[in-house]
């Protein structure tokens, strides 16, 4: 069965960095479909200007990979519902959906990391967008994405050494490794509703 890997987390959580190690070396997944990388390829000095075109290219590539039943990975903040239908379609096509969510303690930590990335030549994201995506992503993780994934895990990426917080399977039990952080995440998932 083919695999769809969802590499998720707020802006600055380390998704791309982790993807370049985990996907090819550990999971043997050679297809990483990333709109940010596509945009940077189209317009290296102004990737924001081609975001819509990059999104179209990304969706076309995903459709080709699914038609060919190839393993592939996507990267997302989960801040929108846009991938729920993709996940459902992939499951219908026989894909096994595996989600890894990289968690940071707060939107402030995410903003700090993004600012650091910008200082090193990375792309900028406005603070209000980072904050909205932080809470939106956590809320959607809990309410939309965990319920439709075959396997999922949440990793604390706020520390120097990453820590597994929780993992679970579709409609089955979950194993909580750090209950304090898991409770914090559940509280954060309600922040979007305020």
Summary of predicted features, one role per range:
Residues 19-70:
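Conserved substrate/cofactor phosphate-moiety recognition/catalytic segment
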């Amino acid at each position: 069965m083919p695999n769809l890997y969802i590499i998720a987390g707020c802006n600055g959580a380390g998704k791309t960095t982790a993807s370049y190690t985990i996907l090819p070396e550990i999971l043997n997944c050679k297809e990483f479909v990333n709109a940010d990388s596509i945009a940077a390829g189209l317009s290296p000095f102004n990737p924001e200007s081609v975001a819509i075109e990059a999104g179209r290219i990304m969706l076309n590539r995903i459709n080709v990979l699914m038609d060919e039943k190839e393993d592939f990975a996507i990267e997302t903040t989960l801040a929108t519902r846009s991938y729920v239908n993709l996940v459902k379609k992939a499951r219908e096509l026989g894909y096994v959906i595996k989600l890894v969510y990289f968690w940071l303690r707060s939107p402030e930590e995410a903003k700090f990391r993004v600012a650091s990335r910008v200082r090193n030549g990375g792309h900028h994201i406005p603070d209000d967008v980072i904050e909205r995506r932080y809470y939106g992503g956590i809320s959607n993780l809990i309410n939309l994405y965990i319920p439709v994934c075959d396997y999922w895990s949440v990793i604390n990426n706020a520390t120097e050494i990453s820590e597994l917080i929780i993992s679970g399977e579709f409609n089955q039990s979950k194993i909580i490794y750090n209950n304090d952080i898991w409770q914090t995440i559940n509280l954060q998932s309600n922040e979007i509703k305020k």
